[in-house]
Amino acid sequence: GFFSTVKNLATNVAGTVIDTLKCKVTGGCRS
């Protein structure tokens, strides 16, 4: 349903943001 889709999108965005922050903090960016 709609809420399930929104939840999945939010989870994906949060995961991306966290990965980006980790990358910047550790300097271990992976492309």
From Swiss-Prot:
Transmembrane segments: none annotated. Expressed by the skin glands. Pfam families: Antimicrobial_2. GO terms for cellular component: extracellular region. Keywords: Amphibian defense peptide, Antibiotic, Antimicrobial, Disulfide bond, Secreted. It is found in: Secreted. One of its GO terms (biological process) is defense response to Gram-negative bacterium. Disulfide bonds join 23-29. Its main location: secreted. Belongs to the frog skin active peptide (FSAP) family. Ranatuerin subfamily. Antimicrobial activity against Gram-negative bacterium E.coli. This is Ranatuerin-2PL. It comes from Lithobates palustris. The lineage of its organism: Eukaryota, Metazoa, Chordata, Craniata, Vertebrata.
